[in-house]
């Protein structure tokens, strides 16, 4: 019987882990400190940058505690924290039983599609392999509890934002940013900084849980009443790009090797729209608030936790283009200085230095005792 690609990769992972385990048994390999390993994929995107942010802040207060790696096969006798439940699913059968494993579960429910339904079933059936589960939002925390994840095994640790890096621009910084990205001076610049296409290619097939169709529809409606320019970042944005082109909405798409360079894009914005149907965060909610950018977000992920509707930003029901547009029109027409001032105060409570200590205190400390 032929072995499929997924099965072959699984066998390779088993072989890698078994090899390191055998070397450890023979006394030829002991692994390396520190005691906690935060595992990410190699892709230069959100999960990797989340890991760097958590780990950097923890190491600043608790040196020698945790490191970032994309090589779980070499981990023996460690606390192993997978930053994505999907990545853990690929390695769960192969990992050394000497490890204590934690998984961050950001988002996903069976209704999101057959593949996600299979993933959820596998995750719940293999809880015995885990020492803990982390999630970022109250929404997903409630969901996991409803599915039977034990309260004692679950911790809610919000995503964070570097409030010293993401700050409101002064007038000169704003002018420089808009000139750099080709934003005309007389337009209203709307931002969308995410990955919303399937895979890592052009992204012409939409990842619908990220709401790219909702974003395009909302922007097209706003463009009837305002001179709109869209600034996009992130990989796999082809679906959104084609949609904007079809509606004649001008845009610029940029991608950064260093994610932190995205701060200059926030400096160019008049509005940020987060139109997802399902989210774990996203970080853009806090980054917008920290950067003084007015925000309209759908009621999903951490947006429900950090947005006080009509106070520091606006919330809209998932899939409700009409409400998204109405809230955006209000911010663009009436001004948003009070919103952005309150949003900045909100973001400061989620600085990485604060949320990383939650991760250390509620998850790592007990496992390291």
State the predicted function of each range.
Residues 179-180, 185-239:
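Conserved catalytic-core segment of nucleotide-activated headgroup transferases in glycan assembly
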Residues 337-365:
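A charged, aromatic-enriched C-terminal amphipathic alpha-helix characteristic of glycosyltransferases
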Residues 234, 238-260:
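Nucleotide-activated donor-binding/catalytic signature segment of Leloir-type glycosyltransferases, i.e.
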Residues 309-310, 314-320, 330-335:
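Conserved acidic donor-binding segment of nucleotide-sugar-dependent glycosyltransferases
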Residues 264-269:
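Short alpha-helical donor nucleotide-sugar binding micro-motif in glycosyltransferases
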Residues 277:
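Aromatic "clamp/platform" in nucleotide-sugar-dependent glycosyltransferases that forms part
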Residues 139, 160:
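Carbohydrate-associated surface elements
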Residues 294-297, 307:
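Short hydrophobic beta-strand element within catalytic cores of glycosyltransferases
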């Amino acid at each position: 019987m032929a072995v499929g690609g997924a099965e072959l990769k699984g066998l390779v992972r088993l072989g890698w882990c078994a090899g390191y385990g055998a070397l450890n048994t023979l006394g030829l390999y002991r692994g390396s400190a520190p005691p906690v390993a935060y595992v990410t994929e190699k892709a230069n995107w959100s999960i990797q940058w989340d890991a760097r942010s958590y780990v950097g802040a923890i190491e600043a207060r608790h040196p020698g505690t945790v490191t970032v790696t994309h090589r779980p096969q070499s981990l023996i006798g460690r606390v192993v924290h997978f930053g994505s439940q999907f990545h853990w699913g690929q390695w769960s059968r192969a990992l050394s039983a000497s490890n204590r494993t934690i998984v961050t579960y950001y988002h996903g429910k069976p209704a999101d599609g057959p593949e996600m339904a299979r993933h959820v079933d596998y995750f719940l059936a293999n809880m015995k392999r885990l020492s803990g589960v982390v999630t970022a939002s109250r929404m997903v925390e409630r969901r996991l509890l409803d599915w039977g994840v034990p309260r004692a095994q679950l911790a809610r640790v919000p995503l964070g934002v570097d409030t010293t890096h993401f700050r409101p621009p002064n007038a000169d910084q704003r002018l420089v940013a808009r000139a750099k990205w080709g934003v005309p001076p007389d337009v209203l610049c709307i931002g969308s900084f995410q990955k919303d296409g399937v895979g890592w290619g052009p992204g012409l097939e939409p990842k619908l849980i990220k709401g790219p169709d909702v974003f395009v529809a909302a922007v097209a409606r706003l463009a009837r009443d305002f001179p709109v320019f869209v600034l996009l970042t992130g990989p796999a944005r082809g679906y959104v790009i084609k949609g904007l082109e079809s509606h004649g909405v001008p845009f610029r798409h940029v991608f950064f090797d260093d994610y932190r360079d995205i701060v200059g894009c926030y400096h160019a914005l008049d509005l940020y729209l987060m139109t997802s149907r399902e989210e774990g965060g996203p970080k853009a909610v806090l980054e917008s608030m920290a950067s003084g950018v007015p925000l309209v977000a759908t009621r999903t992920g951490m947006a429900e936790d950090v947005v006080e509707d009509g106070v520091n930003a606006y919330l809209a029901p998932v899939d409700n283009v009409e409400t998204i547009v109405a809230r955006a029109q209000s911010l663009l027409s009436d001004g948003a200085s009070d919103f952005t001032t309150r949003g900045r105060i909100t973001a400061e409570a989620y600085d990485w230095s604060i949320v990383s200590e939650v991760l250390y205190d509620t998850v790592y400390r007990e496992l390291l005792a």
